[in-house]
């Protein structure tokens, strides 16, 4: 069963940048931008400096991040940024 929403955590070196839900997330990776919807295949990726776009309930939030790592599961995205 495909989940309807993603749990998203963006963790910086010394603080939680964002923790909540998302319908769609766009992440800057070593391969270019990666879009993640609920039900996405499990994957790890390297985070490149850039902007993470989080879409939820008709609004969009943008977070500027440095390098780090991304872990994606069908119902969850975890971002660790330097």
Per-segment meaning from a language model:
Residues 6-82:
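Compact, glycine-rich, soluble single-domain proteins
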Residues 1-5:
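Short, charged, intrinsically disordered terminal tails
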């Amino acid at each position: 069963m495909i989940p309807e929403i993603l749990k998203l955590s963006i963790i910086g070196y010394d603080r939680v940048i964002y923790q909540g839900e998302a319908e769609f997330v766009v992440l800057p990776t070593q391969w270019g931008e990666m879009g993640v919807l609920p039900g996405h295949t499990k994957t790890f990726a390297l985070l490149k400096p850039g902007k993470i776009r989080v879409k939820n309930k008709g609004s969009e939030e943008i977070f500027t991040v440095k390098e780090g790592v991304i872990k994606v599961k069908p119902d969850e995205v975890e971002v660790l940024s330097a």
